[in-house]
Amino acid sequence: MQEKDASSQGFLPHFQHFATQAIHVGQEPEQWTSRAVVPLISLSTTFKQAAPGQHSGFEYSRSGNPTRNCLEKAVAALDGAKYCLAFASGLAATVTITHLLKAGDQIICMDDVYGGTNRYFRQVASEFGLKISFVDCSKIKLLEAAITPETKLVWIETPTNPVLKMIDIEACAHIVHKRGDIILVVDNTFMSPYFQRPLALGADICMCSATKYMNGHSDVVMGLVSVNCERLHNRLRFLQNSLGAVPSPLDCYLCNRGLKTLHVRMEKHFKNGMAVAQFLESNPGVEKVIYPGLPSHPQHELAKRQCTGCTGMITFYIKGTLQHAEIFLKNLKLFTLAESLGGFESLVELPAIMTHASVPKNDRDVLGISDTLIRLSVGLEDEKDLLEDLDQALKAAHPPSGSHD
């Protein structure tokens, strides 16, 4: 169920009990003999057995860990899922999911996707006999046309990284599930479960890089995978243990702590993100702004129908050339030039040279990932300070006098 929120601006109402679940699910003090209110960091690699093969739920920390267990239970609740599994990184989660397949199987992947995902599918998974097809899944007819008898997995992001296309998850699920043997995976990194729940819209797997909004403090690298299907969960749990790409107990503790403020942080990201997007849209030095929260976004109505709001991820084209983009980036004072996103601090990057440099140039050109495309991860700073920083950097790139021409 969901509850209404006055700030939703036409988006879906927020999911009911979200904050309460983030704070309490999996955190019960009764699970510890000390009755600790904050879950413990269980660093032990092994656990005593009462007799050979008789244990209390934990044998070896790769197979299962009490701290990781707390995190997985909490995330499952937030994703509206029965099960969650934590991994050492978002790409570790991607690799593990891919191991559900065998040589000869086809993966259909959204063409505009995280550079690391593109690189893994194109340069690694393909070397092991998997067939990879990159398709614009925002166009449902193209997705349907790409499905073959060998198709076993469809991988989408929404919004996409970095050009922020919205994909209709429900429509994709309808097409994909006409066959009973295709898995639909949605990378929910850019939205988090606070703003979007892919499983409720028909996805089989919801994954994310918890490095980003879920942890929210730029000090943990982690991936999360949530599912409702018991059979799928059992297969992934086996692979999690067999491949061994699990996070450390300390990282699980930190991410679990980050979840407690997720609802508060996401509201602020939305507020600041909207303010920055509106400012950029009115700035003469900006060619185009891409933000699903703006009415100008071509899929704004889909965003309102599918999400409870938007995050702080904004993409825009600065007028001019790479030189103008570089001057803008050099003059920013609050926005840090760095890869990654979703932390409390504001970040800025140039995808063509940074996060998406591994994507072939021809593909970047088709997708619109040009030298003047800039990606912002708007943080939690004071709105006025962020706008002033962007304003002065844009003026440096495009002086009002026009002396740079």
Swiss-Prot record:
InterPro entries: Cys/Met-Metab_PyrdxlP-dep_enz, Cys_met_metab_PP, PyrdxlP-dep_Trfase, PyrdxlP-dep_Trfase_major, PyrdxlP-dep_Trfase_small. Disulfide bonds: none annotated. Its main location: cytoplasm. GO terms for cellular component: cytoplasm. The gene is CTH. Homotetramer. Interacts with CALM in a calcium-dependent manner. The modification N6-(pyridoxal phosphate)lysine is found at K212. Belongs to the trans-sulfuration enzymes family. Substrate binds at R62, Y114, R119, E339. Its cofactor is pyridoxal 5'-phosphate. It comes from Macaca fascicularis (Crab-eating macaque). This is Cystathionine gamma-lyase. GO terms for biological process: cysteine biosynthetic process; cysteine biosynthetic process via cystathionine; hydrogen sulfide biosynthetic process; lipid metabolic process; negative regulation of apoptotic process; positive regulation of canonical NF-kappaB signal transduction; positive regulation of NF-kappaB transcription factor activity; protein sulfhydration. SUPFAM superfamilies: PLP-dependent transferases. Its EC number is 4.4.1.1, 4.4.1.2. It catalyses: L,L-cystathionine + H2O = 2-oxobutanoate + L-cysteine + NH4(+); L-cysteine + H2O = hydrogen sulfide + pyruvate + NH4(+) + H(+); L-homocysteine + H2O = 2-oxobutanoate + hydrogen sulfide + NH4(+) + H(+); L-homoserine = 2-oxobutanoate + NH4(+). Pathway: Amino-acid biosynthesis; L-cysteine biosynthesis; L-cysteine from L-homocysteine and L-serine: step 2/2. Keywords: Amino-acid biosynthesis, Calmodulin-binding, Cysteine biosynthesis, Cytoplasm, Lipid metabolism, Lyase, Pyridoxal phosphate. The keyword Chaperone does not apply.
